[in-house]
């Protein structure tokens, strides 16, 4: 296929974790031949006997797994999903994007690496996990960042910057607008009604239910209703 290129295999300088010879490469159901799979820290590469092959960058790999389902593929293999198109499909994708620029569907390619030695699959998968972990998704890292304003203690000690304002509960109430106070009262009423409804049986509030919620503590003293949840046999 046209995307196959000639390049030197990854070496020790690229953190080679696993090398698996006699491995067939399959792209979207089309066999590419048998060659050697190189799982390195820098990239995932496959080369056939003539020195032609391809490399996959870890940030483009969205999924990898060991597949043993004969319904998905007749042989056990290492499955790799990539967010990209290759070969003739990449040309078709470019043409489709020119016709419909509003299409947000992300391109997907499926690689299957079928080793001659099926016992090597676990080692291949482990090496993939270790190398993939070295290339975290930058979007995941950004989501962990704190978006709020940070109080600069050092700047405050130097007489710069504003001191953050903190309110007690009573002080906070005094800063509420009329609309805010009305909302707070409505929420408190809903909460009170919700607590009350939890301790009513058949719409009747009993004395036991009142005592069980004294001082804000729930105490389970409700008597068991005979026969309602019992599985024992009863003689008649």
Swiss-Prot record:
It holds the Pfam family Voldacs. GO terms for biological process: cell volume homeostasis; chloride transport; mRNA cis splicing, via spliceosome; spliceosomal snRNP assembly. The modification N-acetylserine is found at residue 2. Keywords: Acetylation, Cytoplasm, Cytoskeleton, mRNA processing, mRNA splicing, Nucleus, Phosphoprotein. It is found in: Cytoplasm, Cytosol; Nucleus; Cytoplasm, Cytoskeleton. Coiled coil: none annotated. The modification Phosphoserine is found at residues 101, 143, 192, 194, 197, 209. It comes from the Eukaryota. InterPro entries: ICln, ICln/Lot5/Saf5, PH-like_dom_sf. One of its GO terms (cellular component) is cytosol. Residues 1-20 are annotated as: Disordered. Widely distributed but expressed more abundantly in nonpigmented ciliary epithelial cells than in pigmented ones. The modification Phosphothreonine is found at residue 222. Its main location: cytoplasm. Belongs to the pICln (TC 1.A.47) family. Component of the methylosome, a 20S complex containing at least PRMT5/SKB1, WDR77/MEP50 and CLNS1A/pICln. May mediate SNRPD1 and SNRPD3 methylation. Forms a 6S pICln-Sm complex composed of CLNS1A/pICln, SNRPD1, SNRPD2, SNRPE, SNRPF and SNRPG; ring-like structure where CLNS1A/pICln mimics additional Sm proteins and which is unable to assemble into the core snRNP. Interacts with LSM10 and LSM11. Involved in both the assembly of spliceosomal snRNPs and the methylation of Sm proteins. Chaperone that regulates the assembly of spliceosomal U1, U2, U4 and U5 small nuclear ribonucleoproteins (snRNPs), the building blocks of the spliceosome, and thereby plays an important role in the splicing of cellular pre-mRNAs. Most spliceosomal snRNPs contain a common set of Sm proteins SNRPB, SNRPD1, SNRPD2, SNRPD3, SNRPE, SNRPF and SNRPG that assemble in a heptameric protein ring on the Sm site of the small nuclear RNA to form the core snRNP (Sm core). This is Methylosome subunit pICln. The lineage of its organism: Eukaryota, Metazoa, Chordata, Craniata, Vertebrata. The gene is CLNS1A.
